[in-house]
Curated annotation (Swiss-Prot):
Gene name tied to this protein: folD
GO molecular function: methenyltetrahydrofolate cyclohydrolase activity; methylenetetrahydrofolate dehydrogenase (NADP+) activity
Catalytic reaction(s) noted: (6R)-5,10-methylene-5,6,7,8-tetrahydrofolate + NADP(+) = (6R)-5,10-methenyltetrahydrofolate + NADPH; (6R)-5,10-methenyltetrahydrofolate + H2O = (6R)-10-formyltetrahydrofolate + H(+)
Function: Catalyzes the oxidation of 5,10-methylenetetrahydrofolate to 5,10-methenyltetrahydrofolate and then the hydrolysis of 5,10-methenyltetrahydrofolate to 10-formyltetrahydrofolate.
Cited PANTHER family: C-1-TETRAHYDROFOLATE SYNTHASE, CYTOPLASMIC, C-1-TETRAHYDROFOLATE SYNTHASE, CYTOPLASMIC-RELATED
GO cellular component: cytosol
Pfam families in the cross-refs: THF_DHG_CYH, THF_DHG_CYH_C
Pathways per UniProt: One-carbon metabolism; tetrahydrofolate interconversion
Protein name: Bifunctional protein FolD
Gene Ontology biological process: L-histidine biosynthetic process; methionine biosynthetic process; purine nucleotide biosynthetic process; tetrahydrofolate interconversion
Record bears the keyword NADP: yes
Record: residues binding NADP(+): G168, R169, S170, S193, I234
Gene3D superfamilies listed in its UniProt record: Leucine Dehydrogenase, chain A, domain 1 (3.40.50.10860), NAD(P)-binding Rossmann-like Domain (3.40.50.720)
Protein family (similarity comment): Belongs to the tetrahydrofolate dehydrogenase/cyclohydrolase family.
Amino acid sequence: MNNIIDGKKLAEEIIVKVKAETIKLRNNYNIQPGIAVIIVGDDPASQVYVASKNKKAEECGFLSIKHVVSKETQEKELLQLIATLNSDPKIHGILVQLPLPAHINTNRITQAVAFQKDVDGFHYVNVGKLAANALEDAIIPCTPAGAMMMIEQHCGRDLSGLDAVVVGRSNIVGKPMAALLTAANATVTIAHSRTRDLDDVCRSADILVAAVGRPQMIKKDWIKKDAIVIDVGINRIPAPEKGVGKTHLIGDVDFENVKEKAAAITPVPGGVGPMTIAMLMVNTLKAAARLHNLPIPKF
């Protein structure tokens, strides 16, 4: 049965619309959305993520700038760079690639980004707007925003009468995911690795979002029949069959077994990951429109 949600396909559909809206902005208002990505140090995984973000931004017709600074960069210097980007009218979105070196206060850095340009949705102003259900005015974190679009594709935008369980309580995924589901009228439970009888809690879910960071933690017998299962987990594990030192990605869900029971399920990779980058493009486009007091494109 074809119950696998194709994140790549849905993401490309979104990117097509972003490109069209970008052309409108340029033709009608002479505005080119601009995104600046800051990367501290030379972490290989971060380099790969940033390269994919820059490539997608350029594909969308955005101005895309990458600032690579050494891992010895001091917090004060990083704050100065952010202040410069905050005041640059050509830049509408600022993203600081995480993780940061231990000597830099991550929270201080993320909160230094102007909330209007905070395309990650981490600033307290955007967090508060999401919590207050001011979704039209908030910048929503990319991963939960993408996951929500996948859920809407199967369940519609009104989730009244459906029980949703979010396994994971991070500020980046779990909490904003729960807020989005609540705003869509689902009855929401936030669970985590220390939740008592977690398997029973998961079995109550019509919609299950796994974002706990534990490989294949969610088993087939934890899933209600015909549930929608969104796997946000990205776990890199050894794959010796591919060669010495090789790895592969798996999610928080035991995909091969759970897919036999779920009505719809996202794979890892190829599920939520492509949607996260697509929603970063959406957030940047919307930020550009908002900063110029123009109508906000709908997605």
